[in-house]
Amino acid sequence: MEDSQSDMSIELPLSQETFSCLWKLLPPDDILPTTATGSPNSMEDLFLPQDVAELLEGPEEALQVSAPAAQEPGTEAPAPVAPASATPWPLSSSVPSQKTYQGNYGFHLGFLQSGTAKSVMCTYSISLNKLFCQLAKTCPVQLWVTSTPPPGTRVRAMAIYKKSQHMTEVVRRCPHHERCSDGDGLAPPQHLIRVEGNPYAEYLDDRQTFRHSVVVPYEPPEVGSDYTTIHYKYMCNSSCMGGMNRRPILTIITLEDSSGNLLGRDSFEVRVCACPGRDRRTEEENFRKKEEHCPELPPGSAKRALPTSTSSSPQQKKKPLDGEYFTLKIRGRERFEMFRELNEALELKDARAAEESGDSRAHSSYPKTKKGQSTSRHKKPMIKKVGPDSD
């Protein structure tokens, strides 16, 4: 009996009668409406009710609203270094001018006096107007003004190539130094010039020329000082392949107001090398030799002075020295007698040479006659033999 009841409990849910009973128990609102053909009326009937859909979409909307609120300026995580922003200050031309302009404020640059020792890391040559420095070493540059500029004045530093065939190119670091992790998080890796010790430095790229520059606010000199000092660093060697590639560069320092108007300009040449003292000494010696070989002449006489100097040098070499006398100090009597005899022999030789030259000039009109006489003297006479049969 118990086995039959257990079999019925298993078979009832699987029978068709049980399913029809359960189907009739469902409320009519939960059954999908059908058309006369028995197919669903539309796809919209398959969607969830509106209250259920709003309940499910609620958490997503809350997340979308709360996500922007979490990104506040104070709690924002530090992002990686982004490319430098384009400067809103327009430049006057595609190639910046390098001519010195002091303006109304007497703006000009100055440098510390340093020697040419091998251990020096930064040295400036006045005669060459050139700064020699090592890679990534501090180079103090002095800003001098005769009167205080207006508030909001800025100081811009920009590097350009010195030679005309390279001026249109942008000065940038080589690919090797760009990949080096030597940045402070503020300067872009492709910028050559950096400012040290100034948190207000801005590294900018021009929209039109794509040139790199660094701008810092102008600070008046401190009490007891006559100038303001800015510490620059050059982050690539002058000999790096793919960068400057041994091409000389100029650093242009400009004084600008808050609107970008020029107030003053000054420039100097830069060489980034391993031994600044040695390179400065070598270039100054070459420059000095060049000046001695080609001295400066007043304007208007340069065209005539060049042939005169070249033609006068051979004349000085061909100038006879027979009429000049020299005094020679000799130690010892024996040496003196030897040199005296040598001098007398040379004097006698010169006298005989002069006499012979005089005789040759006097008898130059009779060379053939003398020659004929000399040959006839030594000529053997011919004798005709007379035989017995001759008359």
Curated annotation (Swiss-Prot):
Give positions of region: Disordered.
Answer: 65-90, 281-324, 350-391
Positions of modified residues (N6-acetyllysine): K118, K303, K319, K371, K379, K380
In the record, Phosphothreonine modifications are located at T18, T282
Q: Please list where the region (Required for interaction with FBXO42) is annotated.
A: 111-234
Query: In chain numbering, where does the site feature Interaction with DNA fall?
Result: K118
Q: Where is this cross-link: Glycyl lysine isopeptide (Lys-Gly) (interchain with G-Cter in SUMO)?
A: K384
The UniProt regions of compositional bias labelled Basic and acidic residues, in chain numbering, are 281-295, 350-362
Domain-related comment: The N-terminal and C-terminal disordered regions undergo liquid-liquid phase separation (LLPS) following homotetramerization and activation. Post-translational modifications, such as phosphorylation or lactylation affect the ability to undergo LLPS.
Self-association state and partner proteins as the record states: Forms homodimers and homotetramers. Binds DNA as a homotetramer. Interacts with AXIN1. Probably part of a complex consisting of TP53, HIPK2 and AXIN1. Interacts with histone acetyltransferases EP300 and methyltransferases HRMT1L2 and CARM1, and recruits them to promoters. Interacts (via C-terminus) with TAF1; when TAF1 is part of the TFIID complex. Interacts with ING4; this interaction may be indirect. Found in a complex with CABLES1 and TP73. Interacts with HIPK1, HIPK2, and TP53INP1. Interacts with WWOX. Interacts with USP7 and SYVN1. Interacts with HSP90AB1.
The name this protein carries in UniProt is Cellular tumor antigen p53
Gene source species: Rattus norvegicus (Rat)
